[in-house]
A protein has these predicted regions:
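Short, surface-exposed ligand- or partner-binding patches at beta-edge/loop junctions that are enriched
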Residues: 52
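Rhodanese-like catalytic fold shared by cysteine-dependent sulfurtransferases
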Residues: 3-7, 15-48, 57-95
Length: 95
């Protein structure tokens, strides 16, 4: 998959998980954050997004929330960080 095909690559994990390593170029929008839907509302609802977490569960939940909010672009569940890294060919980096 070409990472350039997505408006954003979104990591929906906790801040601690993000700090332990995330995809280069990803943005963090933690699904457990109180302002998660407010963060999503800042995005282009017609664009394509690649979403990942630790196992794919929270990414799936985030995709459902995005669909309920009216997102119409392609929403891809990348599963885990390692799987997403492999699929997109992006390194895992730390802050």
């Amino acid at each position: 998959m070409d990472p350039q095909g997505y408006a954003e690559i979104i990591d929906v994990r906790t801040l601690d998980e993000w700090n332990s390593g995330h995809l280069e170029g990803a943005i963090r929008m933690g699904i457990a954050d109180a302002d998660f839907t407010a963060q999503l509302a800042t995005l282009d609802m017609s664009a394509d997004y690649y979403i990942y977490c630790r196992s794919g569960n929270r990414a799936g939940q985030a995709i459902n929330i995005m669909k309920d909010m009216g997102f119409t672009g392609e929403l891809v569940n990348g599963g885990s960080v390692a799987n997403a890294s492999s699929q997109l060919g992006l390194p895992i980096v730390g802050d």
